[in-house]
Curated annotation (Swiss-Prot):
NCBIfam families membership: PRK05092.1 (NF003467), UTase_glnD (TIGR01693)
Protein name: Bifunctional uridylyltransferase/uridylyl-removing enzyme
Lineage: Bacteria, Pseudomonadati, Pseudomonadota, Alphaproteobacteria, Hyphomicrobiales
Cofactor names: Mg(2+)
Species for this entry: Bradyrhizobium sp. (strain ORS 278)
Region (Uridylyl-removing): 384-739
Catalytic activity as recorded in UniProt: [protein-PII]-L-tyrosine + UTP = [protein-PII]-uridylyl-L-tyrosine + diphosphate; [protein-PII]-uridylyl-L-tyrosine + H2O = [protein-PII]-L-tyrosine + UMP + H(+)
Length: 931
């Protein structure tokens, strides 16, 4: 980040003996005198070997001291010395000019990231060859000699050759070039030429253009975050370009360097931008991120910037993290990563706010570009408090000791900012952070502080204010249990965000549910209006706390309920509401599990769920909580199908809880669904429409969302008009990253297994399945498979291959196990995870069927293996409920024996369980042809 002084004397000769290597190159020049090509080849071979040794030494030192910046500096020093040696070889041996003309001068300069004096193992090298005037034959030869040597060494080099005049002219018009020159560093050649560039760049480009530069850099940052995902808490972060990553630190320093004309971050303390603590934080963040990035490059052997699941554990081990009860080593490492990302965000906010504050009077244009706030030159008291003022539309302290004389102000400042729609002054945020030690047991028990917190939680824009409280540390100190999950990631592919970010996002979605008007939340929004007024606060605190016990040895739902029982009385809840919050947290996964993995047309399923929820009011609250929770997991997780399943479960259960009464009884819901369907097909003849409606069982009308019903009807009609015995319709769901295959065929006892096997043979991983049978014996199944190709056309061709495989198997032309064995492989992401296999068998969830629930590590071909194994166990599959949660597959099968009876014999149940557990534990089962 600083313009590091890359002094090779700072490193031992064992790292890179520059003098000895230079002498060896001189010796090679003598050995190959007059044979330029041989000299070049010998130099490249020699320097490449030295570079390999130096990199190995840097990696060994990194593993020993885990100091990322030092590693990046070592690598940069080595690269600097290689370029200096190549420059000397070119100018002293290859193209020596004993009496150089004025034009035969050149400065070799490092730019961009390399110019900062820090270099990751697989980073590009950016060079600028500065000339006094236009290019000469000598200059071209020297530059080419250096570049070709670097390329022959296998290095990635970006380069430009310009005169000083050209550099200044282009820097004025191109922000990328301007930023690159901002971070130039002299390497070799004519030093006065480089000094001229630096001096002219400062006077002719930088002066008077701070507003333009800052606006451009902040716009670049916003666009980069938009492309990569706005949250800094995405669980596979990009270390370089992600939010809270190295590029954010770079942007921060570029802006500071440009505006304050500093060359080292330490100078920002002298300028009053950072205090000493913030500067130390800057250095710690930089070193940690460089440690991660250097290890990423060393482990992957390429310029890998994404901290993907398959690399996270190895990086954690290299950095010395160990497992603790309730938290794996990789989860502890990633928690540290996200804490650092949070600190980077805080530093960026401090710099931007400080720039605005210092420029508000002198440069209001810059102020507006940075803050996008309307500024003013006066301050006023904040309504309702003499302890705070409004300073340029930002809340600030009226006196330095406002937190000391009343610690409740540490909560009050956030509530006042929320009520008055104010941003936060950087001095206020600093004061808050420095006063966190005042949030003690006495403040946590203070009734006024807890009242203010509940107002924040249940008022407009709670998500934004809670996130600011979290970023300053107040939320985790005031709600101690929340502090334990700050920046905690869960090492799985299901959750997209850290636990604290997930909970805060869930609050945002809860507020969207309450506002209404969203088609995806129709049921939850309706229920939110109908819950008892006193339960509004109950649902808000439940949503905030439902995952607060993650990372503990005990089941997080049970542990979370215990936390709620301790915390809620302090927040002003009575005993009944405290118990309600605890119950909701303990059962917060129940509704989702039942809706997605049980047969909702089975009476026993509904009765057992009703016994759990106990009352309509509790079911309303659980439905709202479940909706917000699933929606907050990440993009594409919530969809119309899951919404419809929750809706079906809710309305199927309501009459059981009310003794037969339901706001919309079952028959009316079926009739309403059919009427809604009819309205979409006014162009169909009445007889045809009636016949089609009669082909579907009641469960279809209750469980399938309208857009899918419409697609089904058009697909079935066109397939039958074309006379197809088997038809496949392909759809794409970009939000979920899946391709949907809808298969229409004659029903067959092995059809699901055949479909699953055909998908496996094409390398397609099934993530969920919706399986329906019509009254006239046709199967209408929708299978969602993980997307493999970027283009829809390629995905469509893969779907066609799957259809052809199904048809060939049904016609007896293809032996499916052989086709599966040829293709099945597991993706590298799944290899990073370990999921304990689980199989449960019970007869309590259904009166007619035995329910087999299987859970284990997902892999291509797993559903095929399971359905094949179940059939070989002489079981009939009546229905299947297929779902994946990241790397975990959870499949539920409703089965009978060959006579149509439940499996009651304990010995037979044990044999089934043993066979399926063995299958789940075997990594290569899918690749083995069946006998």
């Amino acid at each position: 980040m600083d313009s590091v002084a890359t002094d090779s004397k700072a490193f031992t000769s064992a790292d890179f003996d520059s003098a000895g290597i230079a002498a060896a190159v001189d010796a090679l020049a003598k050995q190959h005198s007059g044979r330029e090509d041989m000299f070049r080849a010998a130099v490249v071979q020699f320097l490449k070997a030295e570079l390999v040794k130096a990199r190995a030494a840097a990696q060994a030192q990194l593993l020993q001291d885990r100091h990322g910046r030092h590693c990046a500096e070592r690598l940069c020093v080595v690269q600097d010395e290689i370029i200096r040696i190549l420059y000397a070889a070119a100018t002293e041996h290859l193209y020596r000019s004993d009496v150089p003309s004025g034009a035969e001068r050149m400065a070799v300069v490092a730019t961009g990231g390399y110019g900062r004096g820090l270099m990751a193992p697989e980073s590009d090298i950016d060079l600028l060859f500065i000339l006094p005037y236009k290019q000469t034959a000598w200059g071209e030869q020297v530059a080419e000699a250096i570049l070709y040597s670097l390329w022959d060494m296998g290095l990635k080099v970006g380069h430009a050759t310009r005169s000083v005049d050209e550099s200044i002219r282009q820097a004025r018009g191109d922000m990328t070039i301007r930023t690159a020159i901002l971070e130039t560093r002299y390497l070799a050649g004519d030093k006065p030429l480089y000094d001229e560039l630096v001096q002219r760049f400062d006077t002719e480009v930088v002066q008077g253009t701070a507003a333009e530069f800052v606006a451009a850099k902040l716009a670049e940052r916003e666009e980069r975050h938009r492309r990569g995902g706005q949250s800094r808490y995405l669980v596979e972060p990009n270390v370089k370009d992600g939010k809270g990553g190295l590029r954010d630190l770079h942007t921060l320093f570029w802006i500071a360097k440009y505006v304050y004309r500093v060359r080292e971050t330490a100078e920002l303390v002298e300028r009053g931008v950072f205090d000493a603590h913030e500067y130390r934080t800057f250095r710690r963040c930089s070193d940690f991120l460089w440690s991660v990035r250097c290890n990423l490059h060393f482990v992957s052997g390429r310029p890998e910037e994404r901290l993907s699941f398959d690399l996270q554990r190895e990086i954690a081990v290299r950095l010395g993290y160990t497992s603790h009860p309730g938290m794996q080593d990789v989860e502890r490492f990633m928690k540290h990563y996200f804490l650092v990302a949070k600190q980077v965000g805080n530093l960026t906010a401090i710099l931007c706010a400080k720039l605005e504050d210092q420029q508000a009077k002198a440069a209001p244009v810059l102020s507006r570009m940075i803050s996008r706030l309307t500024t003013g030159s006066t301050w006023r008291r904040v309504p309702e408090s003499d302890d705070f003022i409004v300073d340029n539309n930002r809340i600030n302290l009226a006196a330095p000791d406002v937190f000391k004389h009343d610690p409740v102000n540490l909560i009050r400042i956030f509530r006042l900012a929320q009520k008055n729609n104010l941003a936060f002054h950087p001095d206020a945020m600093r004061a808050v952070t420095r006063s966190l030690n005042m949030i003690n047991a006495e403040l946590r028990e203070n009734p006024e502080a807890n009242r203010l917190f509940m107002e924040i939680l249940t008022s407009n824009d709670a998500e934004t204010v809670l996130r600011r409280m979290n970023e300053t540390g107040v939320l985790g100190h005031f709600i101690s249990a929340f502090g334990r999950i700050v920046s905690m990631m869960q090492f799985n592919m299901y959750h997209h965000y850290t636990v604290d970010e997930h909970l805060i996002r869930c609050i945002g979605f809860l507020q969207e549910i309450e506002r209404g008007g969203h088609d995806e939340f129709v049921l939850a929004s309706d229920l939110m209006r109908k819950i008892r007024p006193e339960h509004r606060a109950v649902i808000y605190i439940t949503v905030l706390l439902h995952d607060v016990a993650k990372g503990r040895p005990e089941d997080h739902s049970v542990a979370g309920a215990k936390i709620a029982r301790r915390l809620c009385p302090r927040l002003g809840f009575n005993n009944a509401d405290t118990e309600l919050v605890a119950w909701l947290i303990e059962e917060h996964l129940t509704m989702s599990t039942v809706a997605q993995s049980r047969d909702l047309s089975d009476r026993r399923t509904i009765e057992k769920f009703a016994a759990v929820v106990q009352s309509v009011e509790q079911m309303k609250l659980l439905t709202i909580l479940t909706t917000a929770d699933i929606r907050g997991v990440g993009p594409g997780v919530w969809n119309g199908w899951k919404a419809q399943l929750l809706r079906t479960l809710y309305y199927e259960t309501e009459p059981v809880l009310t003794g037969g009464f339901s706001e919309v009884n079952r028959a009316k819901r079926i009739t309403a669904a059919q009427a809604e369907f009819r309205n979409a097909f006014t162009d169909w003849p009445e007889d045809e429409l009636n016949t089609y409606i009669g082909r579907h069982y009641p469960a279809y009308w209750l469980k399938v969302e309208l857009p899918r019903k419409i697609r089904h009807a058009r697909f079935v009609r066109s397939s039958e008009d074309a006379g197809h015995k088997l038809a496949i319709n392909v759809g794409f769901d970009p939000a979920r990253g899946v391709t949907e295959l809808t298969i229409f065929a004659m029903d067959h006892p092995w059809l699901l297994s055949i479909i699953a096997g055909a998908c496996a043979s094409a390398g397609a991983n099934i993530v969920d399945a919706q399986i329906y049978t019509t009254t006239d014996g046709r199967a209408l199944d929708t299978i969602a498979i993980s997307r493999e190709y970027e283009r829809d056309e390629d995905e469509g061709r893969r779907a066609t291959r799957i259809g052809e495989t199904i048809e060939q198997v049904l016609e007896g032309k293809l032996r499916l196990p052989d086709a599966v064995a040829r293709r099945t492989t597991r993706g590298k992401q799944h290899k990073a995870f370990s999921v304990e296999p689980e199989v449960s068998i019970n007869n309590q969830w259904s009166e007619l069927y035995t329910v087999i629930e299987v859970s284990g590590l997902d892999r291509p071909g797993l559903l095929y293996e399971l359905t094949t194994a179940i059939s070989k166990l002489n079981l009939n599959i009546a229905s299947a409920h297929v779902a994946t949660f990241g790397e975990r597959a959870r499949d539920v099968f409703y089965v009978t024996d060959l006579l149509g009876a439940q499996i009651n014999a304990p010995t037979r149940q044990a044999a089934i369980k043993s066979a399926l557990l063995h299958l789940l534990a075997s990594e290569d089962a899918a690749a083995q042809p069946a006998a």
